[in-house]
């Protein structure tokens, strides 16, 4: 399965852009394979994202905002959930990935 990050390249909100960049940079820095899906360029992808976010995770009003993170068809969470997992050092679990073994430094 591939981690997919749903983003909006044409967002006018600086906060959304920063959150999207934070997720993408973290995944790149940790060499986690992922696909960036731009929902502003594909109505089909936008509808898929909306449909596959569990009802209890959707906002009371309006549509969920990017970034939204999936592993295959499994919903991982939004930016706030990602940030919490980053702070608690549980990103691999959050993404549904096996943790990488800690690197061992040679003496």
From Swiss-Prot:
Organism: Mus musculus (Mouse)
Top-level taxon in the UniProt lineage: Eukaryota
Protein family: Belongs to the SH3BGR family.
Matching CDD domains: GRX_SH3BGR (cd03030)
Name of the protein in its database record: SH3 domain-binding glutamic acid-rich-like protein 2
Record's keyword terms, sorted: Nucleus, SH3-binding
GO terms for MF: SH3 domain binding
Main location: nucleus
Localization per record: Nucleus
Keyword Nucleus: yes
Residue interval(s) of motif SH3-binding: 61-67
